[in-house]
Design a protein with these regions (language model features):
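An amphipathic alpha-helix adjacent to DNA-recognition modules
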Residues: 17-22, 55-83, 130-134
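Short hydrophobic clusters on alpha-helical segments that form packing/core surfaces
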Residues: 20-28, 168, 207
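Hydrophobic alpha-helical connector segments
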Residues: 79-114, 161-168
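Amphipathic alpha-helical packing segments from all-alpha helical-bundle domains
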Residues: 92, 126-152, 201-205
Length: 226
């Protein structure tokens, strides 16, 4: 019966669903998953208390949808293989990957509450973290690892691949995660489109140089092995 109460037409339904999702993001970010209530979310959204149950099933699935909403939208907006041909080089793939990741973290359209929720999830993990890592983070890490392995060579050690991939990932996310600190240490550091473009170029060049050096060093070590 509540379906008729909250679903007047498809356009109104879509608007209500979006308002509930946005409100949930703000409430979960402010209070955390455990303390937030469905009533608080619906009141903030200006929606019927039954809206969460209708659109998402329950509070837990709403929370999962909130966590996934931003990464899913960013993956569409900034694909990690955007513009690459089927025969793109590993160097080209790395540059596009870094471009994609930096633009995702600095996307002006990214809601402020998303970073807060992710930070909370790292401190107070819920069951949603495992699925988020498996469905969002793991594919990104695997893709980067595959690029790194190509650049290091087929015989590269798994540990080298892992260390290098995490180093590249760390460079990309540090500028965002430590933004408040960096603003005080380096007030001249900005994050406009042209600034992000320079970061993409720097991280790409820096990482490629390091990977080339490591590949040469490992090859030399292999040649010295009796």
């Amino acid at each position: 019966m509540f379906k008729e109460q909250i679903k007047v037409n498809s356009e109104d339904s879509s608007d209500t669903e979006r308002r509930v999702l946005d409100a949930a993001g703000e409430v979960f970010a402010a209070l955390g998953y455990r303390a937030a209530t469905v009533r608080q979310i619906c009141e903030k959204a200006g929606a019927n208390i039954a809206a969460v149950n209708y659109y998402y099933g329950d509070k837990e699935r709403l929370y999962q949808a909130v966590l996934r909403s931003v990464p899913d939208a960013q993956a569409i907006k900034y694909p990690s293989r955007s513009g690459l041909s089927s025969n793109a080089t590993a160097e080209e793939r790395l540059r596009v990957y870094v471009h994609s990741l930096l633009h995702r973290v600095f996307d002006a359209g990214r809601p402020g509450w998303h970073s807060k929720i992710i930070a909370r999830e790292m401190i107070e993990p819920t069951r949603a973290l495992d699925s988020l890592l498996e469905e969002v983070a793991l594919p990104l890490h695997r893709e980067l690892a595959s690029i790194v392995r190509l650049l290091l060579g087929a015989t590269a050690k798994d540990e080298d691949v892992r260390f290098c991939a995490l180093s590249i990932m760390g460079q990309c996310v540090y500028y965002h995660h430590a933004r408040t600190v960096l603003a005080r240490l380096y007030p001249e550091q900005k994050y406009h489109a042209e600034d992000v473009a320079r970061l993409v170029e720097h991280i790409s060049e820096f990482s490629l140089a390091a990977l080339r050096e490591l590949a040469q060093r490992r090859q030399a070590q292999g040649n010295e092995t009796p």
